[in-house]
Amino acid sequence: MLFRSAGSLGKKLLRVTDVMHQGGDLPMVQHDAKLRDAIMEISRHRLGITGISQDGQLSGCLSDGDLRRILESGHMDLDAPVRELMHSNPMKIESGKLASEALHVMEEHKIMVLFVYEGTENNIVGIVHMHDILQGGL
């Protein structure tokens, strides 16, 4: 007979909602924000990314990797509108999914963060970082 610890099974059933950041912990700036505002939001939340919101919906994202590439290009304008610099199709996962599924998506796409949605894909309710999943025991 095979016995499995309840803790091990519980960790495998961990949901994205169990480890996601939400509410005031969700990094987000408005579509018309300046690059300097996005940098401050990324720094404040320490997740390496900020969402870009237009009319209450996720319209894009900007990551610390994007910032490094902008800096390397020599065209760093802190007053540039973030909408001109953002990725318009950020990676997302549905809130009811298992954390292990989120981890698989992150590994497959070589990313550290997924936006979490509920209902429609632009209804963002949180963000999950790979470190949060791994600290959860996966």
Residue ranges of predicted features:
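Bateman (tandem CBS) regulatory domains
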Residues: 13-26, 79-90
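Helical hairpin unit composed of two closely spaced alpha helices linked by a short loop
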Residues: 46-51, 55-90, 95-97, 101-104
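Short, surface-exposed loop/turn motifs that are enriched in glycine and acidic residues
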Residues: 5, 24-29
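The conserved cystathionine-beta-synthase
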Residues: 28-46, 71, 92-112, 116-120, ...
